[in-house]
């Protein structure tokens, strides 16, 4: 970037996009998780990119934490089959923008336009499994794997995106988020104790959809979803039923008539045996018996592309210590600014914290920085009040009323200005970075 670079403001679907003039030719391409996505051209590289605006990241502590989680994941997960963070910046309006490569289309759109030939199904599944092997090795579960979250370019390179909903690999995990068609049965049955196997189930559903050109389990609601799964797999085995924690769910499942499974070779008669065998290993009721991503890569169906020396795992587990933290917005804000500065390898900013420190130490430093900002803001407000009082000593009562109202405004402005000091260098990097 050059020192004369500046932020340019434009409207996209009624939403303000405020980006540096490094990027031009903005066009909306859709909504991602909690943000609007536009295509653009990077004038430094002349390459197309996708720019995702995070909507109001500091409006609530929940949104701030969610944005922090997505940023941390994008910085940590670096793999050919995962969307890659190329740039991140904070606008003067304090919106956050993620810049990634632009893939052109997604699997959902592709499946709507044409049936996939065998070699494309095989190659796309291989890349999905390759990406999942890496993600799972980092201790991360995607949780929302579906065709629209699988991006593809004109060279058939595939990348998994939207890690905004990803969660820690934790056998006590609760809740569900995935789109119903691709949701693993253990999520519907228990809402807890699920692990990386939920992504394998989702990948299996996507595999079947690529083969047939339509969703395998298009449930209209939870009950119908479970019903059509049992149409193919039969009734869940007793060891799965025994894991159901919800009394109402247990009563529902045990009240259903017994169903025998349909052999996959009968259900998918025209599909090659290796594909049927792998699909059957991915779509297993018991998650403990479901094939892993690593084993699926070694399956005969993946043989044309399988290369054990080129299917990497993560260098380190992702640090989830922040996941249970309940912090105020200003603390998340300081931590977010520091992550942005670290991405651009800019150090030494006032208020910047050491992101290599333990999470507890980061929180302590960020909390202290936020408190210092509030103290500075309060001091500035008092100075403003003193100045107004001095300047307005000879004014009328109405004038004093106006000044008092103005003090409320300047209180708010001063607080915002001071806390934003921690982001000043994140904004200013536009004038310093990549010179």
From Swiss-Prot:
UniProt KW keywords: Acetylation, Activator, ATP-binding, Cytoplasm, Kinase, Nucleotide-binding, Nucleus, Phosphoprotein, Serine/threonine-protein kinase, Transcription, Transcription regulation, Transferase
Stored CDD domains: STKc_Sty1_Hog1
Molecular function, one GO term: MAP kinase activity
Free-text description of this protein's post-translational modifications in UniProt: Activated by PBS2-mediated concomitant phosphorylation at Thr-174 and Tyr-176. Dually phosphorylated on Thr-174 and Tyr-176, which activates the enzyme.
Taxonomic superkingdom: Eukaryota
Cofactor requirement: Mg(2+)
Residue ranges that the Swiss-Prot or TrEMBL entry lists as coiled coil: none
Residues bearing the modification Phosphothreonine: 174
Residues annotated for ATP binding in this entry: 29-37, 52
EC number from the UniProt entry: 2.7.11.24
Subunit structure: Interacts with CDC37, HOT1, KIN28, PTP2, PTP3, RBP1, RCK2, RPD3, SIC1, SMP1 and SIN4.
Extra remark: Present with 6780 molecules/cell in log phase SD medium.
Function: Proline-directed serine/threonine-protein kinase involved in a signal transduction pathway that is activated by changes in the osmolarity of the extracellular environment. Controls osmotic regulation of transcription via the stress response element (STRE) in promoters of target genes. Upon osmotic shock, associates with the SKO1-SSN6-TUP1 complex, phosphorylates SKO1, and converts it into an activator that subsequently recruits Swi/Snf and SAGA complexes.
Entry's family note: Belongs to the protein kinase superfamily. Ser/Thr protein kinase family. MAP kinase subfamily. HOG1 sub-subfamily.
Name of this protein: Mitogen-activated protein kinase HOG1
Species assigned in the record: Saccharomyces cerevisiae (strain ATCC 204508 / S288c)
Gene: HOG1
């Amino acid at each position: 970037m050059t020192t004369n670079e500046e932020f340019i403001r434009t409207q996209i679907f009624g939403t303000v996009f405020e980006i540096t003039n490094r990027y031009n030719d903005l066009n909306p391409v859709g909504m991602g998780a909690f943000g609007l996505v536009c295509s653009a051209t990077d004038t430094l590289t002349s390459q197309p990119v996708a720019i995702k605006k995070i909507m109001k990241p500091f409006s609530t502590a929940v949104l701030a934490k969610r944005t922090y989680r997505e940023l941390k994941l994008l910085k940590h997960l670096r793999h050919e089959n995962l969307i890659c963070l190329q740039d991140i910046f904070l606008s003067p309006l304090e919106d956050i923008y993620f810049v990634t490569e632009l893939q052109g289309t997604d699997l959902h759109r592709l499946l709507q336009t044409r049936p996939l030939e065998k070699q494309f199904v095989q190659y796309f599944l291989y890349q999905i499994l390759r990406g999942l092997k890496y993600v799972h090795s980092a201790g991360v579960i995607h949780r929302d794997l579906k065709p629209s979250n699988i991006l593809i370019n004109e060279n058939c390179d595939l990348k998994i995106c939207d890690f905004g909903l990803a969660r820690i690999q934790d056998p006590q995990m609760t809740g569900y988020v995935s789109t119903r068609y691709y949701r693993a049965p253990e999520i519907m049955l228990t809402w807890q104790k699920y692990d990386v196997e939920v992504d394998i189930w989702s990948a299996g559903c996507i595999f079947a959809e690529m083969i047939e050109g339509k969703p395998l389990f298009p449930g209209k609601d939870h009950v119908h979803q479970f019903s059509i799964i049992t149409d193919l797999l039969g009734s869940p085995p007793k060891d799965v039923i025994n894991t159901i924690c919800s009394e109402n769910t247990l009563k529902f499942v045990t009240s259903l008539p017994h169903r025998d499974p349909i052999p996959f070779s009968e259900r998918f008669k025209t599909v090659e045996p290796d594909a049927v065998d792998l699909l059957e290993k991915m779509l297993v009721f018991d998650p403990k018996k479901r094939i892993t991503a690593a084993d699926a890569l070694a399956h005969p169906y993946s043989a044309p592309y399988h290369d054990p020396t080129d299917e990497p795992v993560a260098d380190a587990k992702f640090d989830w210590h922040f996941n249970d933290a309940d912090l105020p917005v200003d603390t998340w804000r300081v931590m977010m600014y520091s992550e942005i500065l670290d991405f651009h390898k800019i150090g030494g900013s006032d208020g910047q914290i050491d992101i290599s420190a333990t999470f507890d130490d980061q929180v302590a430093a960020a909390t202290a920085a936020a408190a210092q900002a509030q103290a500075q803001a309060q001091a500035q407000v008092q100075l403003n009040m003193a100045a107004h009082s001095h300047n307005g000593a000879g004014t009328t009562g109405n004038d004093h009323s106006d000044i008092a109202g103005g003090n409320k405004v300047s209180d708010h402005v001063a607080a915002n200005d001071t806390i934003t000091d921690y982001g000043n260098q994140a904004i200013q990097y536009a004038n310093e970075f990549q010179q």
